[in-house]
Amino acid sequence: ALTGADASIPGAGLAAADARLDDLLAPELLSLPLRALLKKVGDALDGAYPMDLRSIRATPLPAEASGFAQQIQQMATAFGIHNVEAYVSTAIGPSCIPASAAPPRLVFGSVLLEKGIDETARTFLVLRSLKLLQARAATLSRTAPIDLWPVVAGMLTVFAPTWQAPGVEPKKVAEHQQRIKGALVRQLDDDVPVLAMEVIGSIGNRASQLGTAVNQWGNRTALLAMGSPAAALIGIAA
């Protein structure tokens, strides 16, 4: 793969989308309580920090990309995701960005729709993003590292209001807390405060690494599916 030649390693295909593999594929930082918490409150994070499609001039995939759109839907089904809204933008380069999980939205750089594109690498990018949608980790994946701890602290204090996050201004935490509270649109399960306390006890000072960790999780899932280190290298570099 390092020389550009693909290794002969069969991938697991769409079986890699099975959430039962999460314990094996998720980095250590993404503990079981944190993954469970994201499953329950990740939609609120997406709502609190929406990706502005207008600012990047994103438009729906063109009609001539209908075949690719069908492939996206087929892959998404394996992740338990349906009716993916796919957009294209000239502003984001050769990448696929998971915008939100509810509704499920992906944004592609326009170069990924050009003729001659490496379709294997493009598929890798789609699979990686679909994993992040399945995990409800889209917002974490695209938040700047410097902002991750205030955002995560705000999320945790929604469910553990007496906890004081170290190393971040209380005013900033309160701002994020209110933003996330405003995006909660349904009653959450009774175990959410317990999960939040477990995350508080384990995350330490590593919140700024969460974006890297969730993207690693997506990369591992896509690599398992594809079995192609060359495609992974191209996709990760995008």
Set out the residue ranges of the language-model regions:
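A broad, structural surface signal
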Residues: 127, 220-223
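Short acidic, Gly/Ser-rich segments with clustered Asp/Glu that frequently serve as metal-coordination loops
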Residues: 130-134
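Short alpha-helical catalytic segment bearing the HExxH-like zincin motif
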Residues: 107, 121-129
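Hydrophobic or amphipathic, alpha-helical segments that drive membrane association/targeting
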Residues: 1-105, 111-116, 120, 135-140, ...
